[in-house]
């Protein structure tokens, strides 16, 4: 079962840690009805950290292992081409990410060609789909790849924390821009990519040059 929880700014000032996805916490407060939609909500007055959460621990463990292997080192980062004309995208064919990338591209440079690999970006099979997308587009001689998806919970974004996805990005001959979730979301893919964009829209801004600057 799930229940929405709210903590107002006054109570948040008393926290001695920063809340993040995947943490296990103990919450004290009151349950009341949210008048706008008639749903019950937990109004948190106190939050204490209890453990670190299995997903968060798995994330930290893999991040530390790959960092020790040198996979995040700057010497492996490929430069993003300034004037890309063919851009590969690994993301879902339906969703905010591809819509945002297409809108930004059409505004900045409608002459740029976008090649989409429609990947699963959530669920148990997503990691295999993302890896296949990276490998497929890497063989097409494109200028740059954007790999990512729109926002979600840590569980929703977990495919981008899988080791096989990190290795596919690391081994990719085409420069890769990671674009997973929102600005506050950080994944293993972000560490290993040649460039991290905070959102899919930002990735398009970084990958697509504005042709109007030459007018």
Predicted regions and their residues:
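OB-fold and OB-like beta-barrel modules that bind single-stranded nucleic acids
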Residues: 1, 20-33, 44
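Beta-strand/loop nucleic-acid-binding surfaces
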Residues: 2-18
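A short beta-strand motif that forms part of the nucleic acid-binding face
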Residues: 9, 44-46, 192
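Extended, charge-rich, solvent-exposed interface segments
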Residues: 16, 43-106, 110
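Extended, highly charged clamp/arch subdomains and adjacent linkers
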Residues: 40
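Short glycine/threonine-rich loop/turn motifs
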Residues: 88-215
């Amino acid at each position: 079962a799930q229940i929405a929880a709210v903590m107002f700014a006054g109570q948040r000032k008393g926290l001695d840690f920063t809340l993040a996805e995947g943490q296990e916490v103990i919450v004290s407060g009151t349950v009341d009805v949210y008048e706008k939609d008639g749903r019950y909500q937990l109004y948190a007055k106190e939050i204490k950290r209890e453990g670190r959460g299995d997903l968060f621990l798995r994330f930290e463990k893999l991040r530390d292992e790959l960092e020790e292997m040198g996979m995040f080192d700057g010497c492996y980062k490929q430069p993003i081409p300034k004037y890309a004309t063919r851009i590969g995208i690994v993301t879902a064919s339906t969703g905010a990410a591809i819509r945002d990338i297409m809108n930004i591209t059409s505004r900045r440079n409608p002459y740029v060609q976008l090649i989409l690999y429609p990947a699963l970006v959530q669920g148990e099979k997503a990691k295999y789909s993302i890896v296949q997308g990276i490998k497929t587009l890497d063989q097409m001689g494109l200028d740059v790849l954007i790999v990512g998806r729109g926002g979600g919970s840590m569980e929703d974004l977990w495919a981008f924390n899988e080791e096989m996805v990190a290795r596919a990005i690391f081994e990719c001959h085409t420069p890769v821009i990671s674009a997973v979730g929102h600005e506050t979301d950080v994944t293993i893919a972000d560490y290993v990519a040649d460039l991290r964009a905070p959102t899919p829209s930002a990735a398009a801004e970084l990958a697509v040059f504005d042709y109007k600057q030459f007018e």
